[in-house]
Amino acid sequence: MKPPFKKTVIGEATELPETGVFDSVKFSAIVAPVEQKVKKVGPFKLSKVTDEYPYFSDLLNRIVQQSIRELPDFSDDSKIAVMSDFGGEHSSAKFHTYSFLFVAYNKVGPFEEKIREMRKRYGLLEHYSEFAYKNLSSGAKARALPEYLQLVDSFIHGAIITIAIDKRIETVFGAQKKQAQSVMVTQLKEEGLGEWHGPGAEKVLRIVNIIAAFASLLTHENQRLLWYSDRDLINEDGKKWNFTHTQQILVRVLGMYLSHRLDVVGFAKSFKEKGHLDDLLSVPDLAAGVVQDLLLQNETGEDIPGGDEKAMIMQWIATPARYLSKLTIQIVRMADGGIGFGRVDMAVKR
């Protein structure tokens, strides 16, 4: 399949005028494709992180330096979007999964067009909803899933990044949960960023630190950044904190990591009226779900329940794509009580 954003320029032009006749000028041009900036290779580093930063910032910096080999190159783009979804809330889960799709949003037109054509063929336009990992067992979405995954790999320029954190790690911001979360709750309240409880503060700060860390590596001067999230604890409008507080927290944390200026930072959460944004949001939903299942299988040795649809998503997450980088990082509690991390390398069995 041809790349969805192919461009051409005149590589060479030779003027062939007839002598003394300027209205009869002819041109011969060789048209050559632009060399597309698709991916960039490491090493990478969070250049603003110092010893004064929280432990999680240092951990992310070590992950970036040691475990990230490649990232998408967005240097020619104007709008970057990050779609997020999270898993692991159920009691049987061994990990909290935080999944993010960073995408060159100014290039999503072909993806949107192809998805609409696909949905029309499968009767999925009228009742528009996400491709959710928990709800793919039958029906039109199950039949459309192979084509959907192919369109994701072929028409999205970006990266799907999943960070899985061992549930035995109760906080990534200090040595002890009670002390670390107490400090976070107090600081957020004093800064006018909402009155959070401990688990809520832990979750929102994990998420915005991950977004900001990778935004520092992926965005460039004067680009626009949009964060579009599924509805979740961190963006609900409650009595003591609300989505505006979450937005303000991200803006503060972006300043901790970015050395360049963004033109605009925008925010949205999943709308009642569904559309192509939710087709993008489905990507981290599928990634968070399948990584959760794969890590659980690795921990317990038990087979993952589900049919061909889940097997298909496992094959998708493990298969490299030309335009879409797929990165999964595991953060675990070590036998000695310390914290370890590593890239989760997956392979498809033939």
Task: Give the role of each language-model region.
Residues 2-81, 86-350:
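Phosphate-ester processing/binding pockets and catalytic centers
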